[in-house]
Each structure stands twice: as structure tokens, then as C-alpha cells.
């Protein structure tokens, strides 16, 4: 049994396997449950970056909602889905499939300005939904081929859009950025907190939930 503290008598459900998104929510004091949200991330040709991340975030949130309801979750619980992409010269860079693709991405990013878009979607089982996107400009310093290979050898680029993680060793590749840092990591927390507040979920009005065998129930409130 896991005890979860959340505001407004509802649960926040993160439809993502990303440890970075979980870390960002935890750092802001939110408690939540995580569910898998496996969706195809194949994008149609010619789609804009903002439309791409908003669409994928919404699909992830809806997949997470279906999974949550199938496990007995409340229709009033809030499901959060997100997706992050890197855009360089109007080309969308996703997660590298292998080290060779990671090398190509990092070589292209070297000495250039790129843009990180994260789409954020909130849905519940009562039919309410919304999605938005946040963009941050990131300026890479010029990298040597040796630096690129050394970074790839750390294994860090494997599961990250654009083949780098600004919160880890990849931070040394960045000269500076303009906008939200948490957006580059995977979840724009300034935006997320504002939208959750609109949905009536904050860190006050606490209710105690128990999750047993995947089935949530309210135990009591303060």
C-alpha cells in the first residue's frame, strides 16, 4: 500500500515513464501516481513543432487516463501527459535511435541555436481536457568531435530528445539558454503549476489517499 498526499481530494496522475518529469514534480512538492502511456510517436510530415508536442502530449494523457480508469481510478483525477522535442533549422529532432544518430544530432547542434518545445496536456474522465506548449531557446557552444564522442560514451544521450540532457553532463555543451530551464529538462513547471491551479489543484486543501492493488480510495482529509 502506498500513501499519497494530494490537494483538492483528487489525485494527480503522471502519464509518463520519464524520471526527469517525475523529479521536477517532486521538487515542487507534488505527489502523484505514475502510469504507462505507450503511444506511437510517429509525426506526420509538415506538422509544426507546437502542434506536434501538443498532439503527442494529449495522446499520452488520454492513454494514461484510459489505463487509470481501467484500474479503478476516479473520473475526477487529473492526468498529466507531456512530450518534448528539439527543433533545429525547422527540423524536429527526437530521441536518437543509436550512437551514430546521437553523434549526427550533436554535430548538427554544435555552435547553433535550437529550440526545445514541450507540450503539456491535462485531462480527466469527466471530459475536461486542455493542452499547451512552451518553447525555450538553447545556445550550444562549438564542440570538438572528441567532446561529442566522449559525451556519447557516457550513455546519457540515449533516451533524450536532441541527444543531450541539460540537467546532467550535457549541461557542459550549452553556452546559455533563454526561457524555462525545466522545459528543457522535460516539463515546464511554471506553466504546469499555473494550469494545475486553474484546475483547482494546489499544495493546500490536503486529502489523504491510499492506493492498494492499483485501486485508489480517499481515506480522510484535514
UniProtKB/Swiss-Prot annotation:
- The enzyme's first-digit EC class, named in words, is hydrolase
Give the matching Pfam families: Maf (PF02545)
Catalyzed chemical reaction(s): dTTP + H2O = dTMP + diphosphate + H(+); UTP + H2O = UMP + diphosphate + H(+)
Q: What is an annotated GO biological process for this record, any one?
A: nucleotide metabolic process
One CC-aspect GO term: cytoplasm
Q: Which cofactor does it need?
A: a divalent metal cation
What's in the keyword line of the UniProt record?
Cytoplasm, Hydrolase, Nucleotide metabolism
What EC numbers are recorded for this enzyme?
A: 3.6.1.9
According to its UniProt record, which residues of this chain constitute the active site? 83
Cross-referenced InterPro entries: ITPase-like_fam, Maf-like
Query: Site annotated as Important for substrate specificity: where?
Result: 20, 84, 167
Q: Which superkingdom?
A: Bacteria
Molecular function per GO: dTTP diphosphatase activity; UTP diphosphatase activity
**Compartments reported by the entry:** Cytoplasm
Name the PANTHER family on file: BIFUNCTIONAL DTTP/UTP PYROPHOSPHATASE/METHYLTRANSFERASE PROTEIN-RELATED (PTHR43213), BIFUNCTIONAL DTTP_UTP PYROPHOSPHATASE_METHYLTRANSFERASE PROTEIN-RELATED (PTHR43213:SF5)
Which family does the UniProt entry place this protein in?
Belongs to the Maf family. YhdE subfamily.
What is the role of this chain? Nucleoside triphosphate pyrophosphatase that hydrolyzes dTTP and UTP. May have a dual role in cell division arrest and in preventing the incorporation of modified nucleotides into cellular nucleic acids.
Protein name as it appears in the record: dTTP/UTP pyrophosphatase
From what organism does this protein derive? Desulfitobacterium hafniense (strain Y51)
Amino acid at each position: 500500500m502506498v500513501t499519497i498526499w494530494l490537494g483538492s481530494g483528487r489525485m494527480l496522475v503522471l502519464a509518463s515513464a520519464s524520471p526527469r518529469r517525475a523529479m521536477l514534480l517532486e521538487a515542487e512538492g507534488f505527489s502523484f501516481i505514475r502510469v504507462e502511456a505507450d503511444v506511437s510517436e510517429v509525426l506526420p510530415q509538415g506538422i509544426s513543432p507546437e502542434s506536434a508536442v501538443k498532439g503527442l502530449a494529449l495522446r499520452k494523457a488520454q492513454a494514461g487516463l484510459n489505463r487509470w480508469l481501467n484500474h479503478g481510478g476516479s473520473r475526477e483525477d487529473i492526468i498529466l501527459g507531456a512530450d518534448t522535442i528539439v527543433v533545429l533549422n525547422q527540423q524536429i529532432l527526437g530521441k536518437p535511435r543509436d550512437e551514430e544518430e546521437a553523434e549526427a544530432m550533436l554535430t548538427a547542434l554544435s555552435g547553433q541555436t535550437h529550440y526545445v518545445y514541450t507540450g503539456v496536456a491535462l485531462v480527466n474522465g469527466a471530459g475536461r481536457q486542455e493542452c499547451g506548449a512552451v518553447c525555450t531557446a538553447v545556445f550550444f557552444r562549438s564542440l570538438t568531435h572528441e567532446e561529442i564522442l566522449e559525451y556519447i560514451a557516457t550513455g546519457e544521450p540515449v533516451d533524450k530528445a536532441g541527444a543531450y540532457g541539460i540537467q546532467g553532463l550535457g549541461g557542459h555543451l550549452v553556452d546559455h539558454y533563454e526561457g524555462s530551464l525545466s522545459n528543457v529538462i522535460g516539463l515546464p513547471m511554471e506553466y504546469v503549476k499555473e494550469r494545475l491551479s486553474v484546475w483547482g489543484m494546489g499544495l493546500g486543501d490536503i486529502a489523504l489517499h491510499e492506493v492498494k492493488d492499483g485501486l485508489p480510495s480517499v481515506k480522510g482529509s484535514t
